[in-house]
Regions:
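Short, histidine-centered active-site or binding-site loop motifs used for metal coordination
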Residues: 32, 51, 73
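Extracytoplasmic
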Residues: 61-65, 71, 84-87, 143
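Cell-wall polysaccharide-cleaving catalytic domain and substrate-binding groove, primarily
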Residues: 71-96, 153, 199
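Short, charged helix-capping/linker segments at alpha-helix termini
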Residues: 53-63, 135
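Non-catalytic cell-wall polysaccharide-engagement segments
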Residues: 3-20, 24-44, 95-124, 128-220
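Peri-catalytic and regulatory segments of divalent metal-dependent proteins
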Residues: 45-57, 80-81
Length: 220
């Protein structure tokens, strides 16, 4: 029996060792503090973002969703520029910042590098999309479409919904339905769909577990 065990270990030892290493890494990840998975800079903005979202959306506003979105957009870096020209914490293109400031003059002049302005404009812009995305199955699907619109434009979301309807799918459901349809370029499709899924299914639950208010609209 001992010889059989030695022979088995010689044949499968490497595989067993790799499995043990992966198991150890998984256990290590599970027992890491939730805050360790959130950029340290986020903590400095938590109180202000909570106040802004509750003012714009009500006391039950989805603070965790907005935090997850900023995490995805800029990793909480207020002075960052993207390769395509998006600016600041909420990564607005200059034309979008200007447009938001024009339709919401109470926000003052466009200031995408100002964290306060960027967070309020983000909450307002998300609300703008939310109000224009009716007839969805639930809050999860509506948030998915609102985030897709923030990333790629409301026009594209509306076109994708029409394609879903034409194919016999439910235009009120994003996941597994509308998300499958588009005429966007391949790179734009991949970026947009990852954007929505990563924010709602990965980052929002993380911020919720860390105590950011509003909860996660999608059950993961």
């Amino acid at each position: 029996m001992m010889n059989d065990l030695k022979a088995y270990l010689r044949e499968h030892g490497t595989r067993i060792a790799m499995c043990l290493v992966l198991a150890a890494l998984l256990v290590f990840e599970l027992f890491q503090p939730v805050h360790a998975q959130i950029p340290a800079a986020a903590q400095g903005y938590q109180r202000e973002l909570t106040r802004v979202v509750q003012q714009e959306w009500g006391m039950n506003g989805r603070v965790a969703v907005h935090a997850a979105q900023i995490h995805q957009e800029s990793a909480w870096r207020s002075n960052v520029n993207s390769p395509v020209g998006a600016q600041g914490l909420s990564q607005f293109m200059p034309s979008t910042s200007k447009w938001i400031a024009e339709i919401y003059p109470d926000l003052g002049r466009a200031a995408p590098y100002s964290p306060g302005w960027a967070m309020r404009a983000q909450a307002r812009y998300n609300r703008w999309h939310w109000q224009r995305l009716a007839n969805t199955a639930d809050a999860c699907q509506r948030w998915a479409m609102a985030l897709s619109a923030y990333n790629g434009g409301l026009g594209w979301v509306n076109r994708d919904r029409r394609l879903a309807t034409a194919a016999g799918d439910d235009a009120g459901v994003w996941f597994g339905s509308v998300e499958k349809y588009t005429n966007r370029a391949g790179w734009a499709l991949r970026e947009n769909r990852h954007y929505v899924r990563h924010i709602l299914l990965t980052l929002t639950p993380r911020y919720t577990r860390a105590g950011w208010q509003g909860g996660a609209p999608c059950n993961v």
